[in-house]
């Protein structure tokens, strides 16, 4: 027999003008709040050829000075039809009083990454502070990420990767639109 | 102007008998799938007194050999009323062919932890493999966790912590019921 349970008393907000009021430190990243959907391309020397993918991103908050972050991608075939589930990420973006961002991002591939950076205007640049790897994870040394709000409803994303013996180089780029 | 976007083509399953079919490696942890709600107590020498909290846990999967994990807690006052949002966690539990579990768990407090362990019968024991800390995070050295399905609809949770100069010791324990 299962129990009915109360609704969570502190649901996340997904818009700056929605309860709960965003923490003041979130000001530089308020434009990210919400859900995003779009397309991207990726490649890496150790992968067999480039690939196209679709992606959902969600940023929310609960009134404290961090964003909840989740990303889900799926590969697309030559006809742009879904092929299979692909990269997933979740974590937290902590905003510091001096405007720095500390992003904790984990992936089911066994990678837990702590990135640091800053939100400058409409761009957030992040680079690796520390990477922790699960015992069976592939070797990832470092990554660089750039998120840019090119307008209120368009988010571009570029991701460079240094892994599996390869130097830092382009891995993914995507253009996402705010979901209605 | 925002775009309507297609539904995600690979939604997570929250029950063993629901699509998508769970990966065979998830067999030892199928009992965790779903949402859980319950109460817990916590304390630590560096905290001012013990505390009561309520917690939601969610385990889901997308057909691959890992669970998506999310936990949200909120503190309760002396009258058992919600006081404020508290600990949050998200991450992934990777199941290995030999039955080992690799759990990646991040917290908005700036902690990214990789734990390893095993599911034995109805109990999953995890201990720290590696901890990565955000530059401004408090110092956490290691943790130990035990999740036990005492019956199909009841999950107990014990969490020991070695942090901020204190030796490994009890930190949290909770009893959760499956949400209807």
From Swiss-Prot, chains A, B:
Keyword Heme tagged: yes
Motif (GXWXGXG): 34-40
Binding site for heme b: 171
Cofactor: record remark: Binds 1 heme b group per subunit, that coordinates a highly solvent-exposed Fe(III) atom.
InterPro entries reported in the protein's UniProt record: Calycin (IPR012674), Nb(III)_bact/plant (IPR022939), Nitrobindin (IPR045165), THAP4-like_heme-bd (IPR014878)
Sequence segments annotated as region (Disordered): 1-21
SUPFAM superfamilies listed in its UniProt record: Lipocalins
Job of this protein: Heme-binding protein able to scavenge peroxynitrite and to protect free L-tyrosine against peroxynitrite-mediated nitration, by acting as a peroxynitrite isomerase that converts peroxynitrite to nitrate. Therefore, this protein likely plays a role in peroxynitrite sensing and in the detoxification of reactive nitrogen and oxygen species (RNS and ROS, respectively). Is able to bind nitric oxide (NO) in vitro, but may act as a sensor of peroxynitrite levels in vivo.
Family to which this protein belongs: Belongs to the nitrobindin family.
Comment on protein domains: Forms a 10-stranded antiparallel beta-barrel structure able to accommodate a hydrophobic ligand in its interior. In fact, this fold hosts the heme group, which is located in a wide surface cleft.
Protein name in the entry: Peroxynitrite isomerase
Organism: Streptomyces avermitilis (strain ATCC 31267 / DSM 46492 / JCM 5070 / NBRC 14893 / NCIMB 12804 / NRRL 8165 / MA-4680)
């Amino acid at each position: 027999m299962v129990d009915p349970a109360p609704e969570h008393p502190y649901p996340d907000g997904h818009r700056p003008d929605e309860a709960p009021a965003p923490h003041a430190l979130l000001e530089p990243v308020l434009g990210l709040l919400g859900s995003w959907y779009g397309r991207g391309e990726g490649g890496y020397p150790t992968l067999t050829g480039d690939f196209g993918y679709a992606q959902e991103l969600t940023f929310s908050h609960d009134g404290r000075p961090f964003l909840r972050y989740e990303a889900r991608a799926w590969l697309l075939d030559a006809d742009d039809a879904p092929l299979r589930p692909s990269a997933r990420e979740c974590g937290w973006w902590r905003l510091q009083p001096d405007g720095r961002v500390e992003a904790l991002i984990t992936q089911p591939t066994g990678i837990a990454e702590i990135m640091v950076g800053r939100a400058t205007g409409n761009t957030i640049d992040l680079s690796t502070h520390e990477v922790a790897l699960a015992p069976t994870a592939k070797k990832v040394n470092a990554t660089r990420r750039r998120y840019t709000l090119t307008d209120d409803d368009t988010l571009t994303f570029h991701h460079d990767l240094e892994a599996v013996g390869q130097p830092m180089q382009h891995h993914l780029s995507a253009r996402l639109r705010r979901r209605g």
